[in-house]
């Protein structure tokens, strides 16, 4: 039996400001308990796993420093492409789980998110999309990418996380 390799991609764009702190705390718990790798993105992708491993109360400030100057907008497809082609290329496989924590608003061309998530799925990874609103993300990019995502789950509180626990394997 082989444990699933968990990758968490956290949207830290302006539209996610009010949710990013919760998402990063949850991601940190999975780094510490499940050896997850965590990446943050808005216009670019950056791995923050080493920062989340540190015992520091200033993690949010350090992550803000890492992402400073990324610019406006959210480039989810570009970030997913960087994730699967550079950062996790050798580690993605059938036992991989990729969690995207985002509202789904993407400044890239709408069809590109479908293509990039398709590349992740093509490696055998299962994709779960966690979003902060009661309904599924409705952007054009998300509508096109629906077939690539195994499940959509609301994540706006620890209660939501507890309710999602049974499907997170």
Task: Walk through the language-model features, giving the residues of each.
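Structural beta-sheet core signal
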Residues: 8, 38-40, 100, 129-131
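DG-centered beta-turn motif at the end of beta-strands
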Residues: 10-13, 95-108, 150
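Metal-dependent catalytic core segments for phosphate chemistry
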Residues: 18-75
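Extracytoplasmic/secreted cell-surface and envelope-processing proteins
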Residues: 48, 108-111, 163-164
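Von Willebrand factor
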Residues: 51, 58-96, 134-140
